[in-house]
Amino acid sequence: MSTDMETAVVGKVDPEAPQPTHIDVHIHQESALAKLLLAGCSLLRIPASASTQSQGSSRVLVASWVVQTVLGALSVVLGGTLYIGHYLAMYSEGAPFWTGIVAMLAGAVAFLHKKRGGTCWALMRTLLVLASFCTAVAAIVIGSRELNFYWYFLGDDVCQRDSSYGWSTMPRTTPVPEEADRIALCIYYTSMLKTLLMSLQAMLLGIWVLLLLASLTPVCVYIWKRFFTKAETEEKKLLGAAVI
């Protein structure tokens, strides 16, 4: 039964003529308008990297403002410590105080300008950045000049003096053992005090150097952004010329 059906089907198919085969060849060539649109789409992807770079530079600026504020506070605190001791000539110029105050003001005004904007805040921010740079340079010069300077009562003979401020009319005699021990202990503590004061001055110098670098950060970020934008513009021009 199935064999007869297959024979019948074959009999029906065989008389039919073979269908012609059509091969359609389409040659597609992009127009100049399509190329321009593709180039525009590719160029629109570049600002994504630019926005990423802008966010990175903004974070660097915020970090520099925080560093300025913290270092300014540390400068004031260390300056107050040295002023309490009043053993150094550095406190007479007040370098730790005006340097720290200007740095803290520069950081605070930068944050306010970022939050509120405005020409007045921008002008104040620029002036305080310049002032922070100048005060940091002046403080470094003063601190390096007076790094090893001590007042008269911290000299080498501070432990040999009498308790009175007048000239002693008694001739010098060989100190007794108790007096010799006292002098030795006094010299030991005086040397420790000198080491402490030198360390505080070195810390202040380090803080002022960091403040100098922090005040230069906005300028460095601005120059870097200018070069980055210039490189992006040249890349866009080259890409557009290559597409056209």
Curated annotation (Swiss-Prot):
Regions crossing the membrane: 60-80, 92-112, 122-142, 204-224
Induction: Up-regulated in kidney upon proteinuria.
GO BP term, example: negative regulation of dendritic cell differentiation
Pfam families: CD20
Residue positions, PTM Phosphoserine: S42
Signal peptide: none
Tissue spec: Specifically expressed in lung, kidney and spleen.
Entry's localization field: Membrane
A GO-annotated cellular component: membrane
Membrane topology label: Multi-pass membrane protein
Alphabetically ordered keywords of this record: Membrane, Phosphoprotein, Transmembrane, Transmembrane helix
Subunit: Interacts with MCOLN2.
Family in the record: Belongs to the TMEM176 family.
Annotated protein name in UniProt: Transmembrane protein 176A
Species: Mus musculus (Mouse)
Gene label: Tmem176a
